[in-house]
């Protein structure tokens, strides 16, 4: 992946930023994509390794796009694979489908990299292929969000020749943000079909000490009961959303979608979750309240790991789920294998258990039984 040119600058002028990052949802003549990036190592201090700006033309060949220029630069630096890197982009437009495909490949090949994309605007958000591309980015593990006022101010301070002037939001800035935020949330609110292998192995590995697993992933199956027999109906994958208003965990994402689009009082449901983490106290409480109100829903939760199982609030959350009829269990080998076969783009590769899977299962299962006694 070698673009024919690289167009990088340290900072941009104020008028350039205001023109190209103007967050009006529909704009013409903004044919240059600006990508401000930061690369940090993960850790307590998280030192910033580099921060610059790439430019690219939206109507040129994909290899000339700003996203591809960044990937060429990053891969060309041959940064050590044993270190974990946190990449943040502030972009004037969200990536096109071609760039998204390359980004998904990049993230699959670099499990030590996390990518957050904060966009000023959504590119062709009404077109099906572009909406699917945003969902694919999320499936690949990237975080996608709309730039808010704090992020605009941060870019102004760090990527603009501001000459000491503060960032001043323009007319209808808040209205534009609210519209784009709602639109992106609607695009990403529906469940994904599956996840990529590196996502599954990283987030569902049942380690005793699972450092860096700061996201919750939830695979679900849903059966409706007809003529006293369950009939398979729906399945999918949720992950926690980057939402400055709600910080929506995967469990809340499921409940929101289920209540708005699926739930009927005249239908009985058998729902099974396979989660990377057990629910936090707030989510456990909401799920317990939901089950108390809807006796037509039976829920079984298989979890790869117990979240803060030594904390009494988290223990009480698990007990509240059990008291409202939810079955809470630890994922074992057959459950991981089932998820691999049904919720992962596995290319017909078999599930490969990791060292310590059975031992960790026994440890977590004993802890769960102690909590639920």
UniProtKB/Swiss-Prot annotation:
The gene is APOBEC3F. Zn(2+) 1 binds at residues 65, 96, 99. Disulfide bonds join 280-283. The CMP/dCMP deaminase domain 1 mediates RNA binding, RNA-dependent oligomerization and virion incorporation whereas the CMP/dCMP deaminase domain 2 confers deoxycytidine deaminase activity and substrate sequence specificity. This is DNA dC->dU-editing enzyme APOBEC-3F. It is an enzyme of class 3 (hydrolase). It comes from the Eukaryota. It is found in: Cytoplasm; Cytoplasm, P-body. It comes from Homo sapiens (Human). PANTHER family: DNA DC-DU-EDITING ENZYME APOBEC-3F, MRNA EDITING ENZYME. GO terms for cellular component: apolipoprotein B mRNA editing enzyme complex; cytoplasm; nucleus; P-body; ribonucleoprotein complex. It holds the Pfam family NAD2. It is one of seven related genes or pseudogenes found in a cluster, thought to result from gene duplication, on chromosome 22. InterPro entries: APOBEC/CMP_deaminase_Zn-bd (IPR016192), APOBEC_Cyt_Deaminase (IPR050610), CMP_dCMP_dom (IPR002125), Cytidine_deaminase-like (IPR016193). One of its GO terms (biological process) is positive regulation of gene expression via chromosomal CpG island demethylation. PROSITE patterns: CYT_DCMP_DEAMINASES_1, CYT_DCMP_DEAMINASES_2. Its main location: cytoplasm. Its EC number is 3.5.4.38.
């Amino acid at each position: 992946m070698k673009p024919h040119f690289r167009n990088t600058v340290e900072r941009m002028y104020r008028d350039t930023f205001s023109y190209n990052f103007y967050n009006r949802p529909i704009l013409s003549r903004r044919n240059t994509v600006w990508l401000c990036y930061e690369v940090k190592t993960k850790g307590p201090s998280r030192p910033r390794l580099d921060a610059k700006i790439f430019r690219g033309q939206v109507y040129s060949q994909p290899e000339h796009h700003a996203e591809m220029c960044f990937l060429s630069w990053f891969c060309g630096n041959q940064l050590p694979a044993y270190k974990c890197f946190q990449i943040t982009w502030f972009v004037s437009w969200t990536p096109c489908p071609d760039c998204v495909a390359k980004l998904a490949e990049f993230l699959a090949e670099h499990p030590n990299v996390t990518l957050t994309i904060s966009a000023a605007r959504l590119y062709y958000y009404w077109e099906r292929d572009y909406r699917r591309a945003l969902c694919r980015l999320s499936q690949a593990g990237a975080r996608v969000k709309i730039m808010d006022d704090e992020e605009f101010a941060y870019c102004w301070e760090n990527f603009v020749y501001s000459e000491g002037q503060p960032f001043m939001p323009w007319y209808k800035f808040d209205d534009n943000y609210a519209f784009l935020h709602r639109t992106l949330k609607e695009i990403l609110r529906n469940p994904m079909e599956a996840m990529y292998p590196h996502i599954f192995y990283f987030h569902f590995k049942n380690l005793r000490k699972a450092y860096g697993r700061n996201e919750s992933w939830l695979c679900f199956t849903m059966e409706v009961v007809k003529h006293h027999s369950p009939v398979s109906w729906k399945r999918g994958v949720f992950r926690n959303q980057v939402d400055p208003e709600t910080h929506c965990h995967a469990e809340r994402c499921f409940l929101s979608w289920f209540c708005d689009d699926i739930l009927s009082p005249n239908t009985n449901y058998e729902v099974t979750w396979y989660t990377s983490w057990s629910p936090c106290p707030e989510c456990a409480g909401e799920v317990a309240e939901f089950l108390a109100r809807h006796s037509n829903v039976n829920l079984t939760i298989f979890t790869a790991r117990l979240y803060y199982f030594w904390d009494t609030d988290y223990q009480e959350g698990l007990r509240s789920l059990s008291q409202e009829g939810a079955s809470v269990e630890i994922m074992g080998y057959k459950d991981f294998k089932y998820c691999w076969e049904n919720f992962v783009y596995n290319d017909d590769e078999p599930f490969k258990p990791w060292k310590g899977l059975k031992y960790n299962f026994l440890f977590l299962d004993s802890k769960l039984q102690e909590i639920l006694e």
